[in-house]
Amino acid sequence: MKLADLSSPAFLENPYPLYETLRRQGSFVSIGPNALMTGRYSIVDGLLHNRNMGKSYMESIRVRYGDDALDMPLFQGFNRMFLMLNPPVHTHLRGLVMQAFTGRESESMRPLATDTAHRLIDDFEQKSSVDLVTEFSFPLPMRIICRMMDVDISDAISLSVAVSNIAKVLDPAPMSPDELVHASAAYEELAHYFTRLIELRRAQPGTDLISMLLRAEEEGQKLTHDEIVSNVILLLLGGYETTSNMIGNALIALHRHPKQLARLKSDLSLMPQAILECLRYDGSVQFTMRAAMDDVSIEGDVVPRGTIVFLMLGAANRDPAQFTDPDHLDITRKQGRLQSFGAGVHHCLGYRLALVELECALTVLLERLPHLRLANLDTLSWNQRGNLRGVNALIADLHS
């Protein structure tokens, strides 16, 4: 197996057959010098919780793009994001942002998420059909993260396009030269936009996420301007692309399992459990990476120091050694912890907010449009990403 397999048309349409092959081939598969891949649940879980497995983002860039890419502003910008860093720097930056994503703060966003879902449906409810991607699943999390950042909602469309163009940076397989050009231009556009916004917040601070980072800086927890810009872009990317794609993935999974959908419609109190099962079944986040900071022993194998390990979360979530009948959606499943949010010190910061948004979005949609039917279920166009997986369009007949 090689990295190029993770960018093949077959994989991007349906990664799960390749994941099955990956698990069968062993605990680890070599995909290059000092680079391994694993899709087994126990290995993924063990390495995510191992403190000797850290981040080495620029080394992962070297593995995928070569030495010449290391100085590119795009990758330098991503390297400043706390998602890519190790303690104590990671701990410092994550701590600054964490206060906005506590359980209490995330739960306080439930009324906003519910109201946003209702308002979006108000705009298309009388139509006979609608593209749920453009009219619902993409604007919902974007409006919420824009509110949290106090970003003008009129800028949401241009921001969403730029964010989508940088999202492929997080793919396991390298981008094409053209994709790299587009991603670099999009990062520059976002950096310019937020530089201007940061200057405005310095002059007139508020209670938003950007002002919070600036206040932390003023209180002695120094951040450089570039660190603030990079981490604001990370918050936008994490708060938008992951959830928007997951709303669509959940709807697809439920409609492909009509008995499960019917059960959920009959008892919406099952929604939190159903969301977790949809995340396991076909999550938008498909992989993450770790680097061995020392030799790491796990289940009889040794990951040598300096090795980059591609942890295929989507494969772990379908591992039959962990989940009974893993290729079947079961919204009452109470078996095992899903890997979709990662684990350990780099566990997804915004997972509570994501769950709130997903629960509100699907609950309101099923309440308001109980007869909704997906019209293009057999002709879906996936977004051609190995990570942040989702569809380009999701056409729904609203009153079938």
Curated annotation (Swiss-Prot):
Q: Where is the signal peptide?
A: none
Which domain of life does the protein's organism represent?
Bacteria
Tell me the GO molecular function terms.
heme binding; iron ion binding; monooxygenase activity; oxidoreductase activity, acting on paired donors, with incorporation or reduction of molecular oxygen
- EC code: 1.14.-.-
UniProt entry tagged with the keyword Oxidoreductase: yes
Please name the top-level EC class of this enzyme: oxidoreductase
What are its cofactors?
heme
Q: Which Pfam families does the UniProt record give?
A: p450
Q: Which UniProt keywords apply?
A: Heme, Iron, Metal-binding, Monooxygenase, Oxidoreductase
Cite the binding residues for heme.
348
The family annotation for this protein states: Belongs to the cytochrome P450 family.
What is the protein name given in its UniProt record? Putative cytochrome P450 133B2
Which species is this UniProt entry from?
Xylella fastidiosa (strain 9a5c)
Organism ancestry? Bacteria, Pseudomonadati, Pseudomonadota, Gammaproteobacteria, Lysobacterales
